[in-house]
Regions:
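A general structural signal for short secondary-structure boundary/capping elements
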Residues: 51-57, 73-76, 132-136, 278-279
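Non-transmembrane, interaction-prone segments in cytosolic or luminal domains
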Residues: 50-53, 58-59, 79, 204-210, ...
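Short beta-strand/turn micro-motifs composed of small residues
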Residues: 8, 89, 234
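N-terminal glycine-rich anion-binding loop in soluble enzyme alpha/beta folds
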Residues: 5-70
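Short beta-strand->loop
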Residues: 89-91, 114-117
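Glycine-rich phosphate- or other oxyanion-binding loops that anchor nucleotides, phosphorylated ligands
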Residues: 55-92, 96-100, 146, 153
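Mixed-charge interfacial surface used for oligomerization/domain docking
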Residues: 3, 11-32, 41, 84, ...
Length: 284
């Protein structure tokens, strides 16, 4: 895609393989452990958890700064002066990144941005579908591309089941934490990204395997699902046995293609270890 270059935050969890395939550029977000702030991706999630355990702290995250974006935009422009940069942003309701990008875009008339209203694998799905559209429609205008992106966003469903709610509570990203009630050890909630925000929508009880299946059932009951593909996601520590079971279960439900993504440092800092997520889509 020579005419357009898509830029995303590292919290989108677009894989290195997909970035290379579509020429997507990732801008690192930030993870803070105690007094130390590092770029997302510079240490893996397991090390984040290990350091937090060692120092007795919880991880915190922050978005990309205007300087982070300006550096990337200038580098792309120097390498591809005729390219138009499209920033498909991590949910604006959860971080400053989109605002930072708009500040960085001032005086750079080749940069356009929009809020995807998603994070992690939900944002990744929106981004990759947009990249495919651009590849198939190289002469599309920015308005046409963003109209397509909006149509994808309207069909994406994103949710996950954490096993340790302390990460969500400390991170302050959950918009309705009171919904969970007091007996946190007895439940595993379904956290969905709705209108760009993390919202607890349902409570599951039982083993993680039982809850993961109930969670998938809950997600596919939301409308007329496109069974050609489902994206599944996990944070470090989720057992291979459960992942294998959920892949078989997804196929049993009728999904033809099942892909897996291990989430990076930013989302791992919110959902904690051993979390399970899914991103099905509604039919167009």
């Amino acid at each position: 895609m020579g005419k357009y270059v898509i830029v995303v935050e590292s919290g989108s969890d677009v894989t290195p393989e997909l970035c290379e395939r579509y020429g997507i550029v990732r801008v690192p977000m930030h993870v803070t452990i105690g007094d130390e702030t590092v770029e997302d991706g510079s240490i893996d999630p397991l090390e984040i958890y290990s350091r937090c355990n060692e120092f007795g702290v919880m991880p915190k995250t922050s978005g990309c700064s205007p300087a982070d974006f300006a550096h990337v935009y200038d580098r792309i422009h120097a390498e591809q002066p005729d390219a138009t940069i499209l920033h498909l942003a991590y949910s604006e309701a959860t971080t400053c990144s989109h605002q930072s990008s708009k500040i960085a875009a001032q005086g750079r008339d080749y940069v356009f941005s929009m809020d995807t209203r998603f994070v992690s694998v939900g944002q990744s799905l929106v981004v990759v579908e947009t990249a495919k559209y651009i590849e198939a429609h190289p002469d599309a205008t920015v308005d046409e591309i963003f109209a397509f992106t909006n149509s994808v966003m309207d069909r994406v469903l994103l949710g996950f089941v954490p096993t340790d709610l302390a990460f969500l509570k400390v991170g302050g990203r959950l918009s309705n934490v009171a919904f969970l009630g007091a007996h946190l050890l007895k439940i595993k909630p379904c956290i969905e990204v709705t209108g760009g925000k993390f919202v607890a929508t349902k409570k599951f009880r039982g083993s993680m395997l039982k809850c993961a299946r109930a969670f998938i059932d809950h997600m596919v009951a939301k409308g007329e699902i496109d069974y050609s593909h489902i994206g599944l996601a996990y944070s470090v520590g989720l057992s291979q046995e459960l992942r294998d079971d959920m892949e078989v279960y997804a196929h049993d439900l009728g999904f033809k293609d099942v892909t897996w993504t291990q989430v990076g440092g930013v989302i791992s800092s919110h959902c904690g270890p051993t979390a399970f997520g899914a991103v099905p889509t509604l039919k167009a």
